[in-house]
Structures are given as structure tokens and as C-alpha cells.
């Protein structure tokens, strides 16, 4: 059983690390184009209109390319996140209280402290305060990609720990989006989405093992959630949680769906999201821009808040209970991984797009600068600390 779990984690890590490289390249290309003579073409691409219409007025969705990517494209990513969360809770590193305690407490600390640091820096700025959820997230693709590049210098137990923390972070981000970044709720559409969720539950109880029916109902829920005022990507999570873990014959519909979807998310969905959202013009960016409260709060939250929260909460748990460090891991290595948790990128950019939706365009630039700066510094510092801890043996 342990060998199966270890092999599954290795496969997951390998796909995430390769996807992380492509994710970084996509963000870099977007950044370069946004600061080149071709930046107008980049903006035109993001504003390409797309419409879906069914019936007379029953369904009419008309959005630019950027919104389609953030609303529909990312729902696929959240579907995969939902599958990962369910698997880990039922049959993975989070399946038992003893296994889950350290990464769960670490993740909670890693979400709370960055949010508090951001809020403290932006206190007295009503619009700026809306971004408190931005530095809470960890980008599992980027962070694991950096760990894998270090090879045997980092024990496998730390990679498993980082995976678990990032998954719990994703769960926290989902709850933050659901409860804090929603407005203009439509009771009718919420009721329709709720009925759709009941249909999913019925499919699960009826032991329907084919994933197709769940996806069809999930698309209907996506439309209802989109029109309800809650962010539509949450439909992906709702759908994923209904997929059965086991079929009673030794197979797992959930794991089959997860393994089939992972390469598409790693090599297509997330790189496209990064390309569409990481482009920011640095023209006119000065030291004064970098010291605005929003980018400062994000960068400090990721670079300082994340390691303090993850490491501090873990240290307290280990000192006060019988919890232990991951196997074959030293405190110096553990701290290096805690710093890597500050690589926020994908989810941070996504929450930023929700937090300042409808606000002045300057906030969008500030969010991207803060996320890029905080994630880059966290990645560099984490790798340096892990290399130094290896040499100190």
C-alpha cells in the first residue's frame, strides 16, 4: 500500500514539476510581450469577445477572452483541485488525524499570518484591504517544481509535506473565494445550483461510475453558479467532490479522472492562465510603485508571512504535542520548504483578479507586481536555504 501511495506521489510531483517549468515560461513570455512593441496585440488577444447563446434569452453569456479563461478555463483547474482534496482526505496524506495534523496546522498558520501582514500594511486603505486573501495561497506547481530540481538534496517526506500543505491551502482559498469574494447573489440561481448538487449526490448514491454524467451536471451547475454571483470556478470543486473514490472492483473513478486531467491542467490550463494574467507593463514602474501598500503587502505576506506562519505553527505543534518533523528531515531543511510556500503565483493572481474586480486598473498592475516579486524572492530564498542546509551536513 505504501509503495502504491509513494508511486502515485512521485507521478504527481513529476507532472507538477514539468508543468511548473512551462508555467514559468508562459508567465515570462507574457511579461516580455507586455513590455515590447507587441503589447497591443497581447491586449487585443485578451479582449477577443466570445458568446454562448441557447434559446431566446434562456442563456446568453458574452465575455472577453480573459474572463472566459478565468471563469471557465480555471473551473477545470478547480475540478482537479477538488479531486485531489477528496483523494487526500479519504485515501492519502490527510486520511488520518495523525497524518493530517502537521500539514493542516502548518497550512492554517501559513494562511493566517500573510493575511494579517497584508491587512496591517493596508490598514486604513478600504480598497487595498480587499486583497487580504491574495498572499494566502501556495502554487503547488511552482513550489514542487523547484523542490524536484533540487533532486536528492531534499527528502521525499518534505515533498509530500509541501504537497499536503498546498492542497489544504487550495481548500482554504476555495472557502475564501466562496465566502468573501462574492457579491450580488441571486437566490434563484443559488437554488438551481443547489438542486444540481443534489443531482450529483444522487448520481454518487446510485453508484454511477462513469465520469461523463457528473461533468454534464457540473456544466449546468457552472452556468447557475456563474449567474448566482458566486465565482463560477467553485462549480468545478462541487462536481469533483461527487466523483466516487472506488468502484467496488478495485478501480477508482476519481483517480482515473485525476490522472487523465493532470497533464491537461499542467501543460495547458495553467500555462494559458499564466500567459493571460501575468502580463504587466513595467513602463513607469518606479520604487514608489513597489512601495505602494498593495504590492508591499502581497510581497511581504508571501516572503515573510508564509514562512513565519508555516514554520511557527509547525514548531509550536511539535513542541506542544507528539507531532514530529517529516522523516529524514532537519529543521534547516524544513524552514527552507516553509519559505518555498511563499511561491503564490497562480492562486494569488486569481484571487487578486477577484479582489479588485471593478476597481481602478492600477490595482491590477500592483497585484501582479506584488505576486511576481513575492513569489520570485520566496523561490530564490527557499532554494538557497535548502542548498545551504545540504552543505552544512
Curated annotation (Swiss-Prot):
Signal peptide: none annotated. This is Na(+)/H(+) antiporter NhaA. GO terms for cellular component: plasma membrane. It is a multi-pass membrane protein. Na(+)/H(+) antiporter that extrudes sodium in exchange for external protons. InterPro entries: Na/H_antiporter_dom_sf, NhaA. Keywords: Antiport, Cell inner membrane, Cell membrane, Ion transport, Membrane, Sodium, Sodium transport, Transmembrane, Transmembrane helix, Transport. It catalyses: Na(+)(in) + 2 H(+)(out) = Na(+)(out) + 2 H(+)(in). GO terms for biological process: regulation of pH. The chain crosses the membrane at residues 18-38, 65-85, 101-121, 131-151, 160-180, 184-204, 210-230, 260-280, 298-318, 334-354, 369-389. It comes from the Bacteria. The keyword tRNA processing does not apply.
Amino acid at each position: 500500500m505504501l509503495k502504491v501511495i509513494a508511486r502515485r506521489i512521485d507521478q504527481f510531483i513529476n507532472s507538477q514539476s514539468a508543468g511548473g517549468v512551462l508555467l514559468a515560461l508562459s508567465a515570462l513570455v507574457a511579461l516580455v510581450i507586455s513590455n515590447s512593441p507587441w503589447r497591443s496585440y497581447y491586449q487585443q488577444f485578451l479582449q477577443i469577445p466570445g458568446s454562448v447563446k441557447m434559446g431566446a434569452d434562456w442563456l446568453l453569456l458574452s465575455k472577453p477572452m480573459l474572463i472566459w479563461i478565468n471563469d471557465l478555463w480555471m473551473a477545470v483547474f478547480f475540478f482537479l483541485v477538488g479531486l485531489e482534496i477528496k483523494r487526500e482526505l479519504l485515501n492519502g496524506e490527510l486520511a488520518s488525524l495523525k497524518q493530517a495534523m502537521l500539514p493542516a496546522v502548518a497550512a492554517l498558520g501559513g494562511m493566517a499570518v500573510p493575511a494579517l501582514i497584508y491587512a496591517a500594511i493596508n490598514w486604513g486603505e478600504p480598497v487595498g484591504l480587499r486583497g487580504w486573501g491574495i498572499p494566502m495561497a501556495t502554487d503547488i506547481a511552482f513550489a514542487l517544481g523547484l523542490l524536484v530540481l533540487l533532486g536528492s538534496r531534499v527528502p521525499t517526506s518534505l515533498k509530500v509535506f509541501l504537497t499536503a500543505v498546498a492542497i489544504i491551502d487550495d481548500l482554504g482559498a476555495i472557502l475564501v473565494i466562496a465566502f468573501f469574494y462574492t457579491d450580488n447573489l441571486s437566490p434563484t440561481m443559488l437554488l438551481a445550483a443547489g438542486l444540481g448538487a443534489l443531482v450529483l449526490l444522487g448520481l454518487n448514491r446510485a453508484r454511477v461510475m462513469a465520469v461523463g454524467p457528473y461533468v454534464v451536471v457540473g456544466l449546468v451547475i457552472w452556468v447557475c453558479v456563474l449567474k448566482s454571483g458566486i465565482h463560477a470556478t467553485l462549480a468545478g470543486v462541487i462536481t469533483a467532490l461527487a466523483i466516487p473514490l472506488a468502484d467496488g472492483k478495485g478501480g477508482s473513478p476519481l483517480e482515473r479522472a485525476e490522472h487523465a486531467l493532470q497533464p491537461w491542467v499542467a501543460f495547458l490550463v495553467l500555462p494559458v492562465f499564466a500567459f493571460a494574467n501575468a502580463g504587466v507593463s513595467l513602463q513607469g514602474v518606479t520604487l514608489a510603485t513597489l512601495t505602494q501598500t498593495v504590492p508591499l503587502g502581497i510581497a511581504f505576506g508571501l516572503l515573510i508571512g508564509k514562512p513565519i506562519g508555516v514554520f511557527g505553527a509547525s514548531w509550536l505543534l511539535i513542541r506542544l504535542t507528539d507531532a514530529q518533523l517529516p522523516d529524514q528531515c532537519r529543521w534547516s531543511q524544513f524552514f527552507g520548504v516553509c519559505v518555498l510556500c511563499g511561491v503564490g503565483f497562480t492562486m494569488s493572481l486569481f484571487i487578486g483578479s477577484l479582489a479588485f474586480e471593478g476597481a481602478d486598473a492600477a490595482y491590477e498592475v500592483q497585484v501582479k507586481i506584488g505576486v511576481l516579486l513575492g513569489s520570485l524572492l520566496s523561490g530564490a530564498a527557499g532554494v538557497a536555504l535548502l542548498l545551504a542546509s545540504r552543505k552544512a551536513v
